[in-house]
Amino acid sequence: MGNKLVLLSGVHGVGKSYFLKDRFACDDRFVVLSASDLIGRFKKADDAGDKKVYDVQNNQQILLTELLNEKNRVSKDIILDGHICILNETGTSEYIPEKFFLDAGVNGIILLQDDVDIIAQRQDQRDGLVLDKNIIGEMQEKEKWYCERLFSKYNIGHHVIDSTCEYSKFCKIVDRL
């Protein structure tokens, strides 16, 4: 144990925050941080509810600064609720820069993925906004591809899970990353 950083990633609406709250409500092994909350400390959300990020580079720099501050402050392993692939202001999927993973010291990535129809339903219930199902599917495939790339270039481990993943299995995955 001791200050490992694992990113829990997935498309908007896959249920990352719910998954973490459901599994870690009474847990003290990990510190769970939200990338959007860390960015929000210094910058008002600018996605206008459409889940598009208007300044990817600036957001990542803010996130990196805040994340490194948190890593210095806590001694437990950190689970970061965030993204490795997002929609930019033009609606095009964009990968989070590789440099972020290196500078932040990300030890591993856990991808939470689910059925496209279920994700679309969650998006509608939560935001009243549903991304095209083809885009959701493409984003999930791009996430997997990017994880493979980060592993082959930098040896950043990854694992794909779904919402049925139990707490004990999740902990074992974190330990292996």
In which residue ranges do the predicted regions lie?
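Phosphate-binding P-loop
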Residues: M1-N3
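Hydrophobic anchor at the beta1->P-loop junction of P-loop NTPases
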Residues: L8
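Walker A (P-loop) phosphate-binding loop of P-loop NTPases
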Residues: G13
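Conserved lysine of the Walker
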Residues: K16
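Conserved substrate/cofactor phosphate-moiety recognition/catalytic segment
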Residues: K21-L63
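Loop/turn-to-beta-strand initiation segments
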Residues: V74-G82
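ATP-dependent NMP and nucleoside kinases share a basic, alpha-helical "lid"
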Residues: G82-R126
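Small-molecule kinase domains that catalyze NTP-dependent phosphoryl transfer to phosphate-bearing small molecules
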Residues: L129-K169
